[in-house]
Every structure is written in structure tokens, then in C-alpha cells.
Amino acid sequence: TIIASSRKFSNATFEEIGHLAHEIVSLAETCCAEGADPSCYDAGSSALSAKSCGKESPFPAHPGTAGCCAQEGLEQKLCLAALRHPPQQPPRYRQPPGGELCQAFEKDPKDFADRFLHEYASSYSQAPLPVLLGSTRTFLSTVSTCCISPAPNACFLKEKLERRTLSLLTLISNRFCSCFAAQGKDKATFSYLAALAQKAPGASFEELSPLAEDAAEAFSRCCDSEAEDCMQKELSEHTAKACGALSARDGRVADCCDGQNPIQNYFCLLALPPAPAPELPEAQKPTNEQACSEEGARHATRYLFELARRHTSVPDALLGKLYEASQKVREECCPAGDPSACLDGK
């Protein structure tokens, strides 16, 4: 409950999350008990909503709360349930030194665990729940093991190396699921394609576009999945495809793909800086007819891809603005009485 509440309200304090988690657990224990009144949950959730709307509410603050509280009944409950904070950018959690960890753990193991779950889940709120559960579970196991070890620092170092894959999986999935949630599937696919174009500008649109679409499909399947191995399995398969398609083209990619661990290989690919821009002829803009055809979106994406591979140092944010602008222009002009005049004017 602490993890779920902290993911949902990533900017809330530990105390606010504690109040919310306590109320949710109490409601579940009362209403799921044998012989509980059938109206128990409805009455309990109504009381919880009323408490959320009170002036002295102990729950996480949200700018949308007042709007929800202006509604009544089921609409109010659904509105409050849908509220969530934006993800932390970048994640704020930093692991303290082993000595500090053990001191806090030995003082109060339960409080230590609860505070860690809150801080970690708040920082990586967009990582899939199974990934977060696995990562937090192994870390708490590490603390309980290493704090009774005769050599705690050596123990923490050894365990950190063993947890590296899971830590990277949490970092990667949080980053891409945040992007996916904020941008939507189409723009996230383009962002991924543009990043590939800048890392491997020698590769063509036909080579890189399927990789971007494959990544988008993987994240669309796994970001909200409760399957335990979804993200690791999909990311490993995607890494194999990327390595197979690009290793022969780029020595840097080949070096990243040389390892035995697909998740670490993928992180290496992710960390590659943009390559020098190749000497290429000027990119051809889509014609007005192409822009408004059934394949108009693909023509626009291809043109922006060509810009990205010719200008490998242009930041993702600017390419994203160009993508949004091209979409807006097509939406405005293609249904117009004279699309060509509209497009030329834009």
C-alpha cells in the first residue's frame, strides 16, 4: 500500500502517505472480513472521500482536489481516485552510505523499511509495479543481511553489483514509462526513433523505424502490466533486435552488445552519446500531396528523422516541438478547402 500510494502521489510527504495507506488498509481489513456488511465499502469509501475534502485533510495535497470535491457521490470518488502527481524528474532517491543505512535500520527496522519504500517508489513512480516490488524487496533483504555482516561495506558492495541488473531495469523502465505516459504512444515512438537516428545516423529510416515501433509496443505492454517478468523479457528481446540490426553498422553499438547481460547491454546503448553527423544531401520535405495523404504522418516522421540524423546534436525537446508542430499543421490544413495554400502559408 505504501508503494502504490507513493507511486500515485510522488510529491507527497512520508506522513501524508502514511495516513493514506493506514486508511486504505483499515478499510480493506474491515470490509473484506467475513460477515462484513455489503454496504461496508461504499460507506467506508464515502467517509474517506469526505475526509479527503475536509479542510484539515491529512492526505496528499493535489491542485485537482477542490474540483473533485465540488462533485458528489460516485463522481466525486472516481475523480479523487484518478488524481495523481506528475513523476519526479529526475528521480531524487540517493542511497545513503552503508553506515547510515545500518544505523537507521537497527534503530527501527519497520520505520526504516516504510520510509525507504516511500522514497524509492516516489522517485521511480512510473516503473512497473512488479519491477518496483522486486527492486525494493532485494534492497531490504540486502540491508538486513549486510547490517549483521562482520564487514558491512564489503557486503553492500558485493550486493550492489549483484543487484545491478534490477537497478538498471528500474531506472530504464521508469524513464521510458514516464515518457510514454507524458507523450503518448505516437510521440514516444518518434522520440525513440530520433534518439536512434542520432546515435546511429548511418542507418536508414527503414532500419530504425521498426526498432522504435518495437520498443513502443514493449513499453505499451509492460508499463502497466502486473506480470512479474514482462519488462525484463520484452527489453531483453528488444535489445537482441537492436543489436542484430545495428552492431555491424557501428562499432560503439557492437561494443555495447558484446556483453552477456541484455539489460546491461541496453543501458550501454542508452548511454551512447550522439554520433558525428554524416555528410548527407539535404533532406527532402514531403510534398503537400504527401503530407495530406493516408501516409501523411509517416511522411512527416520520415522527414523529421532525416533532420535528426543530419543534426545529431539537436536536443530531443526541440525535435519533439517540431513533431508537435508538424502534427498541428497537418490537422489544421489537410481538412481545409485548399490544403496546399494552407500548408504553404504555414
Predicted feature residues:
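General marker for long, soluble alpha-helical cores
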Residues: 1-346
